[in-house]
Amino acid sequence: MLRAQAEIKFTLLNQNYEGGKHFRPVFRFADGMLFSGTVISDHTEYLYNHLYTVDIEFFTVEDEAYAAIQPVMSLGMGLTIQAGSRIIGIATLLDYSYVGQKAAC
């Protein structure tokens, strides 16, 4: 699983988003590299055009996916935040770590 800390900002005019454990937008790392991530923070709502520092857990990023995106990842890189194919915001990657899958016995 990939864990990240990022600054996020939602850019759709006058559109706010509800926070909570079920908030899982899609983050675009590069062309064709889209992963949903659970945004973890104490905020119950994300307001239009405000900057928030949050943690994000990408449960669907496992060994093979991480091997594909790791070469393009760098601190300070920009990501787009999407709902389906619609871009709803931007993010800046502040920190990240990866915990790989353990081999089955």
Model-predicted segments: where are they?
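C-terminal effector/interaction modules appended to NTPase cores
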Residues: 1-105
